[in-house]
Swiss-Prot record:
Glycans are attached at residue 461. Contains a masked and non-functional KDEL endoplasmic reticulum retrieval motif. This is Thioredoxin domain-containing protein 16. A motif (Mediates endoplasmic reticulum retention) lies at residues 817-820. Disulfide bonds join 450-457.
Amino acid sequence: MMSSGFSVFRAGVALVLMCSFYKSTEDSLPELTPQQYFSTLQPGKASLVYFCQVGSLSNSVFLEELKEAVKPLQDYGISVAKVTCVEEEASRYCGEEEGLMKAYLFRGNILLREFPTDILFDVNAIIAHVLFALLFNEVKYITTLEDLHSIENSLKGKSNMIFSYVEAIGTPEHRAVMEAAFVYGTSYQFALTTEIALLENIGSESIEHAHLYFFHCKLVLDLTEHCRRTLMEQPLTTLNIHVFVKTMNAPLLMEVAEDPQQVSTVHLQLGLPLVFIISQRATQEADRRTAEWVAWHLLGKAGVLLLLRDSMDVNIPQHANVAFRRAEKDVPVEFLVLNDVELIISHVKNNMHIEEIQEDEGEDMEGPDLAVEDDEVAGTVYRDRKKPLPLELSVELTEETFNTTVMTSDSIVLFYATWHAVSMAFLQSYIDVAIKLKGRSTILLTRINCADWSDICTKQNVTAFPVVKLYKEGESPVSYAGMLATKDLLKFIQLNKISCPVNIASIQEAEKYLRGELYKDLPSSASVSVLGLFSPAMASAKELFREAGKQLRGSVITGIYSEDDVWILSNKYATTLPALLLARPKEGRIESVPLDTTLVQDMAQILANALLEAFPEITVENLPTYLRFQRPLLLLFSGGSINPQYRNTILALVRQKQLDSFTPCWLNLKNTPVGRGILKAYFGRLPPLPQLLLVNLHSGGQVYAFPSSQSVTEQSLVLWLKHLQAGLENPITVLSAQEWKPPLPAFDFLNMMDAPTSQAPTKKVLECQKEAEVQESAELQPGDRSTARREPVEMLRIKRWNTANWPKDTQEPFHHDKEL
């Protein structure tokens, strides 16, 4: 499991940060010149260098956190220093402005990793990132359930695994896991994820916080069998993980025949209680099976032993079948009569003793999540930053090439900013589109980084990111307003290949258009085609239709027919001119809508509304579209495809105008699993399906359920809706009127920038002065530092020292922000 790379790491790791010249009362970081630093490099030693000119005052907050990390990292054999450039220095690092915001981890003269200093936001993040980089073979980062199963299968019959979920890289929990991996990486395979969906897939009920599982794969010999899992229920701290892993190493069940008060096991040493299942020879095998069941359910919480009554002189009450011994000294053994194994489990859980040292460790858990990347998009972008993208498939524009390109060729332009997380996430989808269109499209895919060319973006009225615009010669640019996904953008591009509107020349061509035969070669063609019918004399109405169609370009195919024989189509589809024909080729339906407006916006709205289905399946993508009508949702929850009876009933009432004051729709729980959570919130449990509800989101928040004892028919549904309007039915729940707000308040970056010059750093420097002599000693005797792995107890001492010396005053504003 261990690689030779880690053996090199055990020889010693040096961490040298290229940082700005910074002075405090006591600087625990060795300050080196580039020449001094490079002359001390040794094979197998790792170093991270940041060069800058003397006098630079940037990154002071980062340096304070780095000084906090010096001693813990030294205990792992990792030394920390900073290097200051001089003006005549010729090193390539000294001349890079970007270097001021990075820390570089080297081994010898080989670069291992670059760390932007903004991800090393505190001492936990520094230690977590450094150990994560060095333990890349011991800790596998996974993102999918398939990855987890693959590792699990490879370990069956060989070794066990420790699997952890943390909210983000660099958190205190991530640090704790990496510290555990440093010690136990030779004994177990570690796997780590930040994907909450993966945690949900393995059956975790509570997913609000970090989790750690022990996978018992060594016992599994059948590859089709899953490894048994044990969840660590304590918070993820270094001490708790150490205790948990130690209990996983202990025997599952021990047999003893001595006084329970005299028994000593690793559980007592770790502060955990002991449970004795009292047995006798006549029932020993059955009692052993019971004890094993209890042991599995109390694994990590208590030690379980089988106590033989027949072979000892201890006076055990005749009817007692369980003995319970607390971890505290001088507490007598408790003899109990518990005739149900569940009672044994609950008794242990209700009498768990929490050691004071755990409370001390727990201080790391009390602070708010201000240091956590609460933006999932930003977190994903950071994790994927090393994945190469074939950017050469799109043309990068500059101030010099932008106008020439968009004026001489049909172009799609992505306006983005490299500092903007959503932009960088969408860039992946944009490149995926380029891959799919390679060699098959006449439209040029381009991109421009607004972080570099802000003037161009401002002139193109780009005020938010990302923005996609289509430029065609002689036409105004068209902005893309769809989902930031490959499929939707591809559809937008392909539909824009078609004229808007399409001029239909004959009745036969019009019929082909309505059947979807004119553009069937487009894989992403729209599900609805619109044909405007006008007499030759309706010039103004035709112009309105053309303008309205241009507003919807890229989302719908529009056509226009205005020949002398247009009355044939008008009569066939029973409509008066001017009119719209809405064709849904996949469903074989053609509907007619009369046009009686003289405003472009009104006609565009008619076109947009006409695209909506009468009884749609609600998805994450289309829900906002239907919510804008501000009408109660008549919502049918289905476990799969909708029952034709329900569809026919609803559509019949729609045609009869009986549901005009509602938005009828349905939700497929297989396609949109979040529907299960919605139903549980409404009913308190998952009710039988299908379920027909009326949800009044916009006024009152009442949720009504159609009676399960009745069949859904036109008559019963209309009667039920009338009862609701008359106030004769009671809601099953009432939704809260509270606003949907972000989980955390927005960062006040100006105040955060001012803070280092006022309170927090000053207090940290004062606290650090208390350790001045210790740090001086550490710097004077670098050779005395052991580079081998520490014993767990030593590792825990480091963690506790770090917690005990954390400035208490700096935590108070954090608590206030969390309350906000």
